[in-house]
From Swiss-Prot:
It comes from Escherichia coli (strain K12). Pfam families: HOK_GEF. It is found in: Cell inner membrane. InterPro entries: Hok/gef_toxin, Hok/gef_toxin_CS. This is Toxic protein HokB. Its main location: membrane. The gene is hokB. The lineage of its organism: Bacteria, Pseudomonadati, Pseudomonadota, Gammaproteobacteria, Enterobacterales.
Length: 49
């Protein structure tokens, strides 16, 4: 079975980012990148049932 190389590359990148995040952060709900005067924040809103 052949796989699309683009899909495989995207999957590897996503797994790498997720692994890096799990190793360096205590939570996956908030992720912030700062570069000088710029900041990018990704927040996940979730509620418990």
């Amino acid at each position: 079975m052949k796989h699309n190389p683009l899909v495989v590359c995207l999957l590897i990148i996503c797994i790498t980012i997720l692994t890096f995040t799990l190793l360096t952060r205590q939570t996956l709900y908030e992720l912030r990148f700062r570069d000088g005067d710029k900041e990018v924040a990704a927040l996940m809103a979730c509620t418990s049932r």
